[in-house]
Structure formats: structure tokens, C-alpha cells
Amino acid sequence: MEKRWWHNSVVYQIYPRSFCDSNNDGIGDLQGIISKLDYLTTLGIDVIWLSPVYQSPMDDNGYDISDYQAIAAEFGSMDDMRELMQKAEQRGIKIVMDLVVNHTSDEHPWFVEAKNNKNSEYRDFYIWRDAGENGEAPSDLGSIFGGTAWEWDEENQQYYFHLFSKRQPDLNWENPAVHQKVFDMMNWWIDQGIGGFRLDVIDLIGKEIDKKITGNGDRLHPLLQQMNQATFGNKDLLTVGETWDATPETAQLYSNPARNELSMVFQFEHITLLWEDGDKWKPKPLDLNAFKQVMIKWQLELSNNGWNSLFWNNHDLPRVVSKYGCDGQYRVESAKMLATTLHLLKGTPYIFQGEEIGMTNVAFDTLEEYKDIETLNFYKVKTDSGVSHETMMKGIHANSRDNARTPMHWDDSAHAGFTQGSPWISLNPNFPEINVAVALEDTDSIFYHYQKLIALRKQNPVIVYGDFIPLFEDHPAVFAYERKDADQHLVVLNNFTAESQTLTLPEHLTDKEVECLIANLDPVTHLGSHLVLTPYQSIVVRL
């Protein structure tokens, strides 16, 4: 495999609205991010994935873009953006822009003109259909945010298509003029000096509406190859696609270098395992064996013909320590264990802001405290269909996107040092105990565990390129594996439970003196025939 710079990089995702507010309007901004670059340098990351900061009416917190080449005033200006890129570059950090090209805002000039003039060149930039015989929607396709994916436009006497909110009309990727406009815009950003793109719901751009195909349409991969050739293909940029329905087979189509599409994709098979019947509002406990089967499958099947992205959480998902670990008694131990589990795998790790200090889910008491459009839409859809308020709030507490979007905890001052104004969303009340200032003062904190994991990846090519060999595949409580190349042999052992686990080690690991590279509890220097892992214990040793 040809080595690329992003193979041994670690990416840190920033959700700007909730990261750091420099002007005290309650909304995080670009100058706030600039003020924290030294913190990120201390952590050791070398890429920032920046959630959208483009001009937007913020119906979906910036994932509804009204101008791709302007910065939303609440985040700052293009001068601030250039300053961020320059100061990040001085610290060896690249900026990956979050790009949404499946849809735009309904306030984008393209859509405004398409709506106002049926003869406009922009009319066919979007998907319009006549009503059915009785005025009904053209099909029963549903919006990902709940309800129908069709919105009636009274003035035009037609429906337009929106897979997300009605204020996020889908672009018509069957129109070559759309390709050209999007590719020109992408090249403009590349010329500004960005390090790559995270492509939002990119598996939807090949949709075939009249066949009711939304994801993974036949045109998807030819479109991505066209995008690659026209924009980032020869620029050595990191590109990662959000692909909710990806399998290892389709992930190879996206990320095999020979196909000239993307660097890697985000797959969500390990995420949806914790949804009952695929419904995120019906959470279910972690089945570790099922989870391991998914992770092992992805590690083995992409080992030579693609590249994995490694992540636990992001701006759309609940906090990792609350979902997969224990956010109470064993918060610190389980957060470190989960970090080790992920960062020793083969692929590019992603850290979501606050993950490195063990931030937890929030359980707001009232629906009114939630700001997320998906949460509010689905609350109405579900309760209208008979789901009780109590049941729905339980699902919201577990899986609302706002779990990830409460402000970053910088210290124990008012509003956690995020702002001196009134924050756009309430804080998690545990910020006095869980914050950056506390973490930096404690050499045994979760933060320094992440710092060490990042350093280990940089120092040990076996973590980046070595073979992945599963251990104890059927053990219901332990996720263990080996990483091996011609020079090094690592063993990674992780207890996912609050009970001690006794392992009978295989013969090739028995009676060995070992070097402990990282542990969340006491280090191990000798492997006998048996090993006891205490609750949430995690060990990485080198033979």
C-alpha cells in the first residue's frame, strides 16, 4: 500500500457553534477556535475537521448552506477563516472543510431563482415534480428528519424534493451544470489552502428519485470519480465521505486508491447496532460480540484494498463514554479503555471535541431545552403516532444529536469558559468536574491518555500499517487483538464491563516478558498463562 500523510494522522472534529465563543454572543466562532490552537497542539492532533461555517440561515445548524464561498457572520469572516488556516498551518495542522453538496439551503440564490422563475437555468438544479392525480405527493419517499420528502410550492404548483428539512432542497446531480458549479466551488476552497473535505451524506448524490433509490444509486461512483478528477484527485488531500449504508464491499469502491474516489468513508454499522430495529429513538444495550464482529469484519476486509476511518462519536452521535462505557463510577477508566480500543486499530482515528476529556451525554429535563431540528421533528412524528412522552424522552436522552452539541467545557467558571454571554444551548451541568483545566492539571487524566495514544501512533508504524489479528473473538466482555508487522508485535486487551474478567492466554502469548506501551490502570510487564482484567481495564503490550 502506498503510504499517505493521512494514514498516521489523527483528526479532531470541531463543531464551531459549541467550541469557544470569542465575542460573547453565546455562539462559538472562528476566533474562538484560533484561541485554542495551542491546546490542540498539546493534544497532538494534526488535522481539524471543521463542521460547516458557511453562510446559512441555520435551519440545520449550518448543514443548510446559502453561500458556499462566504462565512456565516456569527462565526466570523473570510479573513478569520484565512487566519485560522494560516495559524493552524504554522502548527502543522491541516483544516478539512465539511462540505454539503447533496442539498443547499432554500435561501441559496440558486434555489431562490429556481423557485421564482421556471425558465431559469437554475430550475433544473433542483428536483421538481408535478402532484399526483389528487394533489398528493409524487411518491411516498420520506425525509430523514421525519415526514414526507416532498414540499408543495404553491406559487409553482409543483413539489420539490428534500431528503432532510423542507428548507434543505436536494440538488439535482443528474444535471451536469450542477457538477460544474460544485466543482468550481471546491477548487476555490482548495486554492485557499485547505487540507481536504469531509463530504456530508455523499452516498445520496446518485439518487434516482423516480425509482425510489436514494442511497448508493448507480451514478454515485461515476460521480465521485468525476469529482475526484475535477477537483482534489491530484492534490494529496484527505477526503472522507459520510456513507450511512456502506458495507466493507462498497467502502472498498470508495477508498481503494486505484479507483480514484475518496481517501476513506465513515461507516455506521457499529453505531446502528445500538438501535432497536434500526430506530435511533429506541436505544438498546451494547452486544459486545455483535460489535466485535462488525469491527473485525471492517478491519480485515479493508486491510489491503481501502482505508478505515475510526470513530466513536461526532456532532450527530451520543458521547462515547455514555454509549459504550460507564459515565458514572468508571467514567475515567472506561473513557481511556474506549480510546485505546479505537486508536490501536488500523485506520485514521477521529476525536470529537470533548471526547478527550470524557464529556458525557446530557439529559435535559424538558423538550424545550433541545435545539436539534431532527430531535424536535421526530418528537412530533413519534408522539403523534402514539409513542409516549416518557418513552420519547428516554430515546432523546440516549441518542439526540444535542448530546454532542452542548458547549465545550474549558474550566469551572460560569458557562464553563465557553462564553461570558448566554450560550445558544444549555451546558451539561457536570462541567465543574469535567473540564479542560482539570484535565490539564492531572497527569493521569483522559486528556493525557489521548495524547499518549496519538504519540504512539506517530512512533510505531505497526499501529498504522501492521496486520490486525483478532483475539478472544467469542468472549462476551473483552475486545482483544494483535497488531503485527516484520518488526513489532503488539497485544491489545480491553475489558468492556464493570466486572473482572479472567483470560486464558493462547500459547504464543504465554510466559512472555513484555513492555507495557499504555494502560489505564496498573501496567503489565509479564504475561503468564492467565490474565485478570479488572473493570474497564485496558492494556497494550509489546512482545
For the regions a protein language model found, what residue spans apply to each?
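Acidic/aromatic-lined carbohydrate-recognition and catalytic surfaces
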Residues: 2-183, 187, 191, 202-257, ...
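Beta-sheet entry/capping signal
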Residues: 47, 92-94, 186, 195-198, ...
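Flexible loop/turn segments at secondary-structure boundaries
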Residues: 56-57, 103-105, 204-209, 246-251, ...
